[in-house]
């Protein structure tokens, strides 16, 4: 393994990619754009590249393929709540600390799970959700949260987001959600749209809604199973199209067909 150490600082800017062609000759290493000499054996140092778990695209969006990468995006999005994220593999967050995303004015990017799963989301906090506030430009889609175990110690708990003002599309949550106060499977408050989403699990039965607690906007073709009797605890002038899968009159295949119809309605 060989290393070179330039005499002057080399500045590599975050979010950019740098490609060099390396040629080895008798006098040193030649890189595209610069020549570096006086190189020596690295003395046994490891030359293995660190697996960051993500790559950054030209537009600044993250492509994430493991827990380390998702946590790196989480850290970045705390400073810039418009950064897009796309999952390219299933993610295991078991044993990882999660900071929910979206304070005022809220997350405004696109989080695309591409049908992949996030498992192991297991934590207790004042309020526990993957996202805090999704603003009117924000989108969360094609995401599965499986086997969550959430406890809101000082308020509400929901699977996907505390307050939705954007779009939640084709997302699902399974597991157990409890709280000192209110619980819901997808969102606590809905001021946006929730389409083709489902929840299957156990909620603390206090002001709970399998899809949302308070709905002020639109819920379309959503389904749930589990111990809760209503898709929305309270509807405040919105539209609620949410159906419980009881295994008798409504089965999960019915739910799948209904959600697929909603997702392809505009095609």
Please give the residue ranges for each predicted region.
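Extracytoplasmic cysteine-anchoring/structural motifs
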Residues: 1-52
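Surface-exposed repetitive/solenoidal architectures
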Residues: 49-267
